[in-house]
Amino acid sequence: MSVLGEGGLAMSSESRRLVIVGGVAGGASAAARARRCSEGAEIILLERDGDVSFANCGMPYYIGGEIADRSKLVVASAQLLRTRFRIDVRERSEAVSVDRAARTVRVRRLVDGSEYDLSWDRLILSPGAAAIIPPLPGINSQGVYSLRSLMDMDRIRAAVDAAPAGARRAIVAGAGFIGLEMAEQLVRQGFAVQVVELQSQVLPAFDADLAAAIQEELVRNGVQVWLGRGLREVCEQGGRVQGVTLSDGTRLPAELVILGIGVRPNVGLAVACGLELGPAGGIRVNEFLQTSDPLIYAAGDAVEYPWGPSGGTARVALAGPANRAGRLAGEHAVSGRCAAMRPVQGTSIVRVFGQTAAMTGLSVRAARRAGLACRSATVIAGQHAGYYPGASNLTLKLVYEPVTGRLLGAQATGADGADKRIDVLATVLAFGGSVRDVAGLDLCYAPPFGSARDPLHQAAFVACNELDGLGAMLDVESDLAGWQVVDVRTPAEVSRAPLTAGTQVIPIPLDELRGRLGELDSQKPTVVSCGVGVRAHAAQRILLQHGFREVVNLTGGATLRRRVVPPESLGVTGDVR
């Protein structure tokens, strides 16, 4: 659908110059789209670095050697933009100020420091974001790096290649997406890696029960994880990093330190010229990417986008929204028309060794922080038919409104299949769907690809059962003291992986439950558990229909519980199904 935005007038023959500040995802997309929509416009792209458009999401994989050819990361060279799109690309040119009244940008040539004024009829700001560099002692030591540009990537790759066999120890500060991707790739390059995270879990955007699987994968691959600690200082000798000291005084030796603790939007240019910021500190835009000055647009990591799951706005430093926003801004700037930017949802994914974590929308923690009432449903199920070779478990969590069932978000972890489930759920979320909509989805199925009852369906069934009063769930991290806890797995399963309940557990296999109801107190609140929750639901229905007053199913069963609440003793563990 094409729509006319505020101030959305096509540039006349007398007003034909579009200036774009910043390249990469937002700016380069804007430039290319603007040219496709207007052959007559003069389009000037200013980029302070030498690389105009590159795949920054691929940089960790070049450092680790998975991507062998550096040139593959260059999405569009300056020369390609000049010849194919007739764009005036000015590399190593920095916009230092904007005069809105005069409609000029002050530009500094970084090669010689000279400056000039550049007039514009429409202006697009795509300044991106900068890595957060904490003001710590030793932070500027040689061997301390952040990763935002190809130059950063080249410096890190050179340090990795030059590191001798006896000095390949790395600290990664921050356990978000970039931090964990870098940890994986440094292990691939033969480094001993330690990850430091200020929060109490890795992947802080996820709920703890899903993030626990990724932490297990890190540990399985030799990565030591330090949670609930930050950096106090970088230790150096002769200007060269020797390690770090954590906030609790722990000293970790290392020859390489990677800072992945977040980014800060580059809004200085916007603030200086009087553009409005949003509540999260990004440039405020409308659905057509116009700022508070309708002749100036903004796109990319410095922008606050409409936030779909809970309303309002949010900064989302992801390539997908930046590309879409740049494309729309470029079209609207030269034609006055474009489709409205849809709200973003933070749909994202990361691979950590043999596991994948993906999410869209709100986690339980984020929903509660936003003041939203929510419930969740978690299942552990095969990513395709169990009888077909290569089946592996996928953990899938839906977050939804407790009365309407409207989907608020979803998370998934597993060796395979997390991506396609989250993509489906992102679509449901974008169109305001509910868990009942998910339960009724018609999805493709053949044994190599899925199950007749997909994990999506199974999670939605759990949610619908709770909405319909057929199966209340208890959060996996709940304190079980005061509950009558019944484990309906077989004796062998219980022995192999005891339920970490912190209280007495009554083991009654499901197939024996009807004959042993007398061993239980029907008036006492009861928690039932199995391996992943399926048999526990059957037990729950039996007990409720035999007059038990309150029966809840422990979300995710013993498998998820043991991730979130570690076993009290070092017993023999194994797969629990």
Language-model features: locations:
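Rhodanese-like catalytic fold shared by cysteine-dependent sulfurtransferases
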Residues: 7, 436-447, 451-484, 490-527, ...
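Mid-to-C-terminal Rossmann-like scaffold of FAD/NAD(P)H-dependent oxidoreductases
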Residues: 12-17, 302-415, 447-451, 455-483
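Beta1-alpha1 glycine-rich phosphate/pyrophosphate-binding loop at the start
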Residues: 12-89, 94, 183-206, 338-340, ...
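N-terminal Rossmann-fold NAD(P) dinucleotide-binding loop
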Residues: 27, 179-180, 536
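A Rossmann-like FAD-binding core segment of flavoenzymes
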Residues: 40-42, 84, 90-111, 118, ...
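Rossmann-like dinucleotide-binding cores of NAD(P)H-dependent redox enzymes
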Residues: 73-74, 167-171, 177-234, 316-322, ...
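Glycine-rich dinucleotide-binding loop and its adjacent helix/turn
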Residues: 125-189, 224, 285-287, 505-516, ...
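FAD-site-proximal beta/loop scaffold in flavoenzymes
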Residues: 140-164, 236-245, 250-331, 424, ...
